[in-house]
From Swiss-Prot:
The keyword Cytoplasm does not apply. It is an enzyme of class 2 (transferase). Residues 1-352 form the Ketosynthase family 3 (KS3) domain. This is Fatty acid synthase. The keyword Ligase applies. CDD domains: PKS (cd00833). Homodimer which monomers are arranged in a head to tail fashion.
Amino acid sequence: MEDVVIAGIAGKLPESENLQEFWEKLLNGVDMVTEDDRRWKPGMYGLPKRNGKLKDISKFDASFFGVHPKQAHTMDPQLRLLLEVSYEAILDGGINPATLRGTDTGVWVGASGSEAGEAFSQDPEQLLGYSMIGCQRAMFANRISYFYDFKGPSLSIDTACSSSLMALENAYKAIRNGRCSAAVVGGVNLLLKPNTSVQFMKLGMLSPDGACKVFDASGDGYCRSEAVVVVLLTKKSMAKRIYATIVNAGSNTDGFKEQGVTFPSGDMQRQLVSSLHRECGIKPGDIEYVETHGTGTKVGDPQEVNGLADLFCQCEREPLLIGSTKSNMGHPEPASGLAALAKVVLSLEHGL
């Protein structure tokens, strides 16, 4: 069975207009989490004053993407960003998007909501109907397929923080199983209103000072953040550029837990990774680095680290390096998996 590879990648992350800027900030240890009023007044409703924000989400080349001005003004900025960054990802793979028209290319997008849709729908007398088309999560994938004339599967996935990696898994398996020859996989998250943050704060999930102190004793919650990342997956024979090969992908869920539905299970994470490695012949000692979920919460970090230690550190080996993008840029929730993947791909590309 032919290998599936990452053939192109593009993204916008906090204070980073593209992946080159993102990489430079990672290398220089720049804190991409900021305190300003680009979304709402810092400290409103007692919220943490800092979060991770994209530089500018106000502009969109509507005519280029075949979007009528009336539609563009009521289209979720998340979808506008996905259209733009998907184009960049395909070009990054050395492919002219026009050559993919009519092909079985699929689209999978990880996203968890549309705060813009709620805002655009507040006044029934002002509704034009376009916000329903521009803000439905189904359209996050379908509009991409429509613009490029892709004929493969097209769907949006919401599994909260794992959404974009679930999208990646589904796309990978679709290519492996012959449902499509290539796939555009995206993850997106924007913070457009304070209400969602207030709910997370009330649940005790947010760091009061707006920082993900990953794997640190001072960890007291996570910092919310924005991101949009898109990768192009293809069969190896189709790729003009190869960043990395995906050797396996899978998922499970924790089931019932006494501590509640939001409590993570390090044991289930360990079981999943162990089974995936066993399927493709990877030994624990072969792994040199793990890019973790690592959000800086008092509950999640210990569960994850203990699971990794049980899996990878029960044999003689060199030290296992671990890390998390969230200590640099905050937690972009449904887009976090692809943001982490971007960091790893960039590290490989630069020989680190």
